[in-house]
């Protein structure tokens, strides 16, 4: 091969994450073996040594498995499995949305976070403990919204105390750093709970009306993991929450044309993610 051509190909052979961009991460078939390590932040990071959540387990079932987004740090896998067991003991089965890709990194659609193996989406909708959905059902069933956004109120006909129990179970887990829910759901919890201390971890955010997003804190043995700012003290049932609900209601009453967000770029990933991305036996296509 002429030297000039080799020089042109060299950047590709080196495999920088900026060159390969986000879609390269979604083409990886397997986690990187070895001790678990979280690198970077929730929105610009990757994970080595991830585990795969079983598609069906005691009290849980993975939804949209064709996306291949059911991987996470072993602490995240353990949390989901424990929540599943406790939900099964109450007669239910959790439906699990996206965790991370096999080695984390940016996804081509759906999320800006979920990059470091510490995030999981859990549907509010549950199934009876003994019902296992077919593969077609896991790909096709839609997540029902639990709010009436134009009214700024919870949809009481869909909401169940079981959903509150799942939220509280996650919030009381010490490894959980925060949980994102729609502000209308948090407002309803602020009104219904007598002991609101656990609501500190439950944070209002856009969307999240059909699922809640659980985020773990950085593991102590992952020195390259970048944490978020700590949550302010208090239960969060305050004027700021009122403003959140007002803004969500106004947005629903006067909707703007939907603009699909650009997929997150790989340019912001830490340099250490290069080795995670480019190690052998990674590619499925």
Model-identified regions with their sequence ranges:
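Bacterial N-terminal signal peptides
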Residues: 7-16
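Sec/Tat signal peptide C-region and signal peptidase I cleavage site
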Residues: 17-21
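Extended, low-complexity, intrinsically disordered C-terminal regulatory tails
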Residues: 25-26, 30-33, 79-109, 180-201
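Catalytic cores and adjacent binding grooves of peptidoglycan-active enzymes
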Residues: 26-28, 136-285
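Active-site acidic/histidine clusters and adjacent loop/turn architecture
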Residues: 32-97, 158-169, 173-176
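Solvent-exposed loop/turn segments at secondary-structure junctions
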Residues: 69, 100-105, 126-131, 184-188, ...
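Extracytoplasmic
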Residues: 89-91, 115-119, 209-211
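Acidic/His-rich structured neighborhood in mature extracellular/periplasmic domains
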Residues: 101-156, 214
């Amino acid at each position: 091969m002429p030297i000039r051509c080799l020089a042109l190909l060299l950047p590709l052979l080196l495999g920088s994450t900026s060159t390969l961009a986000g879609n390269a991460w979604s083409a990886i078939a397997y986690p990187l073996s070895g001790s678990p390590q979280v690198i970077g932040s929730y929105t610009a990071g990757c994970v080595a040594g991830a585990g795969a959540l079983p598609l069906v387990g005691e009290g849980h079932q993975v939804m949209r498995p064709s996306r291949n987004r059911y991987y996470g740090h072993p602490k995240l896998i353990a949390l989901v499995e424990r929540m599943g067991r406790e939900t099964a003991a109450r007669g239910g089965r959790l439906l699990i949305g996206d965790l991370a890709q096999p080695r984390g990194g940016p996804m081509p659609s759906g999320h800006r976070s979920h990059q470091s193996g510490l995030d999981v989406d859990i549907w509010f909708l549950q199934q009876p403990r003994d019902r296992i959905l077919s593969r077609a059902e896991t790909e096709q069933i839609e997540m029902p919204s639990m709010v009436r956004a134009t009214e700024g109120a919870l949809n009481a006909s869909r909401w169940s105390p079981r959903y509150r129990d799942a939220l509280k179970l996650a919030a009381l887990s010490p490894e959980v750093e925060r949980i994102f829910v729609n502000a209308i759901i948090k407002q309803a919890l602020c009104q219904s709970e007598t002991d609101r201390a656990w609501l500190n971890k439950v944070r209002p955010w856009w969307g999240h009306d059909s699922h809640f997003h659980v985020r773990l804190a950085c593991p102590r043995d992952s020195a390259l993991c970048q944490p978020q700012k700590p949550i302010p003290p208090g239960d969060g049932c305050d004027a700021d929450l009122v403003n959140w609900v007002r803004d969500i209601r106004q947005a629903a009453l006067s909707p703007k044309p939907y603009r699909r967000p650009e997929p997150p770029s790989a340019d912001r990933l830490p340099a250490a993610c290069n080795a995670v991305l480019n190690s052998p036996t990674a590619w499925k296509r």
